[in-house]
């Protein structure tokens, strides 16, 4: 995909990535949000987009390191996420001691902007639970 960025530009990357980042329902019913995500992608320099894509493609598997995480961890994933599918998020949650996993319905990779109320509620609940633990 990095080559696509260099040869066809940011718009081509947006065309490829938007279906992975947003749910089909969002793409069909929220054109303003789709345009906002498109602008976020297209406003980047080609070299930055290509560099990010190459770095993601070449990154090492860090799953073995997850067991070393000792801080409270909340993993949030969209049920339709293609970039980090729920099965991958579950794998992470299973490897991190005492991790919490939340799956947001009708959302993909950008669940925080597709379903902000659900996302914010998960974060708020997690933070409240941390506060209760600290008091005890």
Question: Where do the PLM segments sit?
Answer:
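A short, basic/aromatic alpha-helical/loop segment that forms part
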Residues: 43, 59-60, 82-83, 110-113
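Structural signature of beta-strand start/N-cap positions in the alpha/beta core
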Residues: 65, 72-74, 97-100
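Short beta-strand/loop motif that positions the catalytic acidic residue
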Residues: 69, 75-77, 81
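Short alpha-helix in the alpha/beta-hydrolase fold that links the catalytic acid
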Residues: 71, 85-94
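Catalytic active-site module of serine/aspartate enzymes centered on a nucleophile-bearing elbow/loop
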Residues: 98-136
């Amino acid at each position: 995909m990095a080559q696509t960025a260099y040869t066809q530009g940011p718009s081509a990357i947006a065309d490829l990535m938007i279906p992975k980042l947003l749910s089909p329902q969002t793409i069909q019913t929220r054109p303003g949000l789709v345009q906002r995500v498109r602008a976020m992608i297209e406003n980047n320099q080609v070299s930055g987009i290509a560099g990010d894509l190459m770095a993601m493609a070449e990154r090492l598997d860090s799953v073995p390191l997850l067991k070393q995480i000792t801080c409270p961890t909340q993993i949030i994933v969209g049920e339709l996420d293609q970039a980090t599918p729920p099965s991958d998020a579950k794998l992470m949650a299973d490897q991190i001691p005492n991790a919490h996993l939340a799956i947001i319905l009708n959302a993909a990779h950008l669940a925080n902007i597709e379903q902000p109320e659900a996302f914010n509620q998960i974060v708020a609940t997690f933070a409240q639970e941390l506060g209760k633990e600290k008091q005890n």
